[in-house]
């Protein structure tokens, strides 16, 4: 009945937000969701349950008989959740309530350690057969808030290191997995907060700890047995090389020492993560300087050297954490085989490299929004879709013909305001978007992206009169078009800008750096007139008129402004509302403009004789609470539409032959209804209506076209549904097989979902 064809979410900006599992692939936190993905292709699962941001995830061991994967997650909602893959989806089988935000998790075989923002560290024993976490002990890191752990089991006991809001690294020890941890030593040397730790066990009694800090350096510490020769070294010698002084501690009945071994310098900003290679003596580090480095010891000298560097040069991104930047890479991971690395950054997108013949080759990966998605729009032919979110980006997704998966093919708009709505032009050459500003903006496809979509996705969009590419001027805020005339080239076919060179050579979905810089749409027009932030927008089905509304608390500003799309001049101002107009919809033949708003009114304006002007037709108080959305039925139904409201009703209305609005039927729900959309086609002579609620529930309602009072629902299963508000829901305008349709969903949970709906 239901199956997701595509899922898009970005990764949280936290170094502990992701892990790479040998069984499941990438596991990462996406705001309040947990995503499980194949980084080479697509997201396979999304799990909802936490009420706060996911800060850490890890995979737990399974027993030999029952190999169903387990995932443990911690979040700012002060809970740990245990998830198990049952049949075809993950289920939360246990929730542990804690006293503070969960910052980090660490797993070693059946031992799990959890760190919280109140400085408490809790140790659990994991039993896969009983599917249970049992608390063994807890202790408090009195001097720091833990941000990351590293744990190693040696022959004589267990060593747990803790880093966080301090220059120090705290070393705890336990004689066995069932005894409590005691503070054994404190490692000093870093000059700023230590952000990350990672252990490499080298023998039964030795290990190497890697630590990364905001001081931009990585330090290596060797743990080994305390020998008799250590007693003979004088204190005077230690004073002369203080940083190399061994730190002695007892684990069980054995004395061990920790010695600073090496200082790795290569990053130009905070070191966010360090990760040992699964089998080799190699370290992967990621940094806020937008680079990842692979370190290896030289075979002759033993000195650690850089053998691979991925990402960007520091000079190319300019700002650093010292200037308030939140850019760069937030974490890096090896895959379980050790031949691939991934990292994620501010935009939520993943970057992936694979080692081939000693060279690191970049491959396309997955991406998505990092904040709530407010609007989506379909290409009229269903070949691609657009999304707009409060992460201040609009994104274009299309199906890559080689792997048949939906990838982000362009990032048309990278804005300075949260996006609130988006509408695609019927001509397919561009779109209209609005944000938390008084201006709406019109964008058109550049030729580089038109050709990219044709080459990779078999999507044919006419490119006549389109600009070649787009860029953002150094001191500008708008995407500026670049054309042949501006380059001094007479023949437009001969124009080869750097953007055209790079994008024209792509035979795969673009990388994250392409999306951030080279795949912008040129902004061709700004639409002025509103006195407050623009809230909703729409374009008529014939493409001749654009309509916008803004936030308002007075009738003066609660208007719809119409713009003629040839010149983009304001054509008319439609009145009728007294508060914010939340949705604007043109009837299939553009004869009526339907609007609804916070004032609980539904207003209709009818087309005048000149076809560009509209006259006030009717205004009715349709609901008892704010009306969030409305939708027209297919044109064969006449003028039949639905409205959705916070009062938990969807109501159906029809303009009869006497030009009166009649109340036809109503559907009641258990939650506020936030999104509705009629399919623009019939299924076996039935109307199809998709409904989304504030609680994330999604319904498909069917109704015989001869009897508009009989509606039959089908509900999306809870494990597939978002857990937060549905901001917009849209049927794909086309289908290939009768009974197999697609539904596009914009969620407050940061996700864009493409759902396949199979009807009998």
UniProtKB/Swiss-Prot annotation:
Gene Ontology BP annotations: protein transport; tRNA wobble uridine modification
- InterPro entries from the entry? Elp2, G-protein_beta_WD-40_rep, Quinoprotein_ADH-like_sf, WD40/YVTN_repeat-like_dom_sf, WD40_repeat_CS, WD40_repeat_dom_sf, WD40_rpt
User: Sorted alphabetically, which PROSITE patterns does this protein's record hold?
Assistant: WD_REPEATS_1, WD_REPEATS_2, WD_REPEATS_REGION
Please indicate if the UniProt record lists Cytoplasm as a keyword.
Answer: yes
Give the pathway annotation: tRNA modification; 5-methoxycarbonylmethyl-2-thiouridine-tRNA biosynthesis
Write out the annotated subcellular location. Answer: Cytoplasm; Nucleus
| Gene3D superfamilies, per the entry | YVTN repeat-like/Quinoprotein amine dehydrogenase (2.130.10.10)
Q: Does the keyword Transport apply?
A: yes
Q: Where are the WD repeats?
A: 49-93, 97-134, 139-182, 189-231, 266-305, 324-363, 368-407, 414-453, 576-615, 622-663, 668-711, 721-760
Checking Pfam families in the record gives: WD40 (PF00400)
GO CC, sorted alphabetically, is: cytosol; elongator holoenzyme complex; nucleus
Q: Which UniProt keywords apply?
A: Cytoplasm, Nucleus, Protein transport, Repeat, Transport, tRNA processing, WD repeat
Tell me its family: Belongs to the WD repeat ELP2 family.
Instruction: Give the multimer and partner information.
Output: Component of the elongator complex.
Q: What is known of its domains?
A: Folds into a two seven-bladed beta-propeller structure which is required for elongator complex assembly.
What's this protein's name?
Elongator complex protein 2
Classification from the root reads: Eukaryota, Fungi, Dikarya, Ascomycota, Taphrinomycotina
């Amino acid at each position: 009945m239901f199956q997701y064809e595509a899922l898009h979410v970005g990764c949280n900006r936290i170094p502990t937000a992701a892990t790479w599992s040998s069984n499941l692939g990438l596991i990462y936190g996406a705001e309040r969701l947990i995503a499980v993905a194949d980084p080479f292709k697509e997201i396979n699962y999304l799990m909802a349950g936490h009420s706060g941001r996911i800060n850490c995830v890890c995979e737990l061991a399974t027993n030999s008989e029952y190999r169903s994967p387990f995932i443990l997650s911690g979040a700012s909602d002060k809970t740990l959740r245990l998830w198990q893959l049952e049949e075809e989806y993950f289920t939360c089988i246990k929730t542990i309530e804690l006293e503070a935000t969960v910052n980090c998790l660490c797993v070693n075989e059946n031992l799990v350690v959890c760190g919280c923002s109140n400085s408490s560290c809790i140790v659990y024993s994991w039993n896969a057969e009983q599917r249970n976490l049992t608390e063994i002990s807890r202790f408090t890191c009195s001097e720091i808030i833990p941000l990351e752990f590293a744990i190693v089991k040696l022959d004589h006991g267990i060593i747990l290191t803790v880093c966080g809001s301090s220059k120090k690294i705290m070393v705890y020890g336990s004689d066995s997995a069932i005894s409590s941890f005691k503070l054994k030593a404190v490692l000093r040397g870093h000059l700023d907060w230590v952000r990350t730790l990672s252990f490499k066990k080298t023998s039964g009694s030795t290990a190497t700890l890697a630590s990364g800090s905001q001081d931009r350096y990585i330090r290596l510490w060797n743990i080994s047995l305390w020998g008799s020769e250590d007693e003979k070294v004088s204190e005077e010698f230690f004073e002369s090389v203080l940083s190399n002084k061994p730190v002695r501690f007892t684990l069980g009945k054995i004395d061990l020492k920790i010695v600073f071994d090496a200082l790795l310098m290569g990053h130009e900003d905070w070191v966010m993560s360090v990760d040992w290679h699964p089998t080799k003596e190699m370290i992967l580090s990621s940094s806020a300087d937008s680079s990842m480095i692979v370190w290896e010891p030289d075979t002759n000298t033993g000195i650690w050297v850089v053998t691979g560097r991925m990402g960007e040069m520091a000079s190319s991104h300019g700002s650093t954490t010292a200037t308030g930047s939140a850019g760069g890479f937030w974490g890096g991971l090896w895959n379980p085989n050790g031949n691939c690395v991934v990292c994620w950054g501010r935009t939520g997108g993943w970057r992936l490299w694979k080692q081939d013949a000693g060279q690191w080759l970049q491959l396309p990966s997955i991406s998505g929004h990092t904040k709530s998605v407010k609007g989506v729009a379909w290409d009229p032919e269903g070949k691609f879709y657009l999304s707009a979110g409060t992460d201040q980006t609009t994104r274009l997704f299309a199906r890559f013909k080689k792997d048949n998966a939906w990838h982000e093919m362009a990032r048309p708009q990278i804005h300075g305001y949260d996006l609130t709505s988006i509408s695609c032009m019927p001509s397919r050459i561009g779109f209209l978007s609005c944000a938390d500003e008084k201006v709406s903006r019109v964008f058109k496809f550049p030729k580089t992206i038109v050709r990219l979509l044709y080459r990779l996705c078999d999507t044919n969009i006419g490119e006549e009169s389109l600009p070649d590419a787009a860029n953002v001027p150094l001191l500008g805020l708008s995407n500026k078009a670049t054309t042949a005339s501006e380059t001094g080239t007479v023949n437009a076919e001969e124009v080869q800008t750097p953007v055209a060179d790079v994008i024209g050579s792509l035979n795969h979905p673009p990388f994250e750096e392409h999306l951030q810089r080279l795949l912008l749409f040129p902004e061709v027009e700004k639409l002025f007139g509103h006195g407050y932030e623009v809230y909703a927008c729409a374009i008529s089905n014939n493409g001749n008129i654009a309509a916008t509304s803004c936030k308002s608390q007075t009738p003066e500003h609660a208007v719809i402004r119409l713009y003629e799309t040839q010149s983009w001049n304001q054509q008319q101002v439609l009145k009728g509302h007294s508060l914010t107009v939340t949705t604007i919809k043109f009837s299939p033949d553009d004869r009526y403009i339907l609007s609804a708003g916070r004032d609980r009114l539904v207003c209709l304006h009818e087309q005048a004789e000149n076809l560009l002007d509209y006259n006030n037709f009717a205004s009715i108080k349709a609901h008892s609470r704010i009306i969030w959305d409305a939708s027209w039925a297919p044109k064969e139904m006449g003028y039949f539409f639905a409205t959705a409201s916070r009062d938990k009703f969807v109501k159906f209305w029809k303009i009869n032959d006497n030009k009166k609005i009649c109340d036809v039927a109503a559907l009641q729900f258990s939650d506020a209804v936030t999104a509705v959309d009629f399919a623009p086609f019939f299924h076996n002579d039935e109307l199809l209506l998709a409904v989304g609620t504030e609680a994330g529930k999604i319904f498909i309602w069917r109704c015989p076209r001869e009897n508009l009072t009989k509606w039959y629902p089908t509900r999306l299963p809870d494990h597939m549904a978002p857990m937060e508000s549905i901001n917009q829901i849209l049927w794909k305008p086309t289908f290939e097989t009768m009974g197999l349709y697609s539904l596009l969903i914009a969620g407050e949970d940061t996700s864009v979902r493409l759902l396949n709906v199979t009807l009998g």
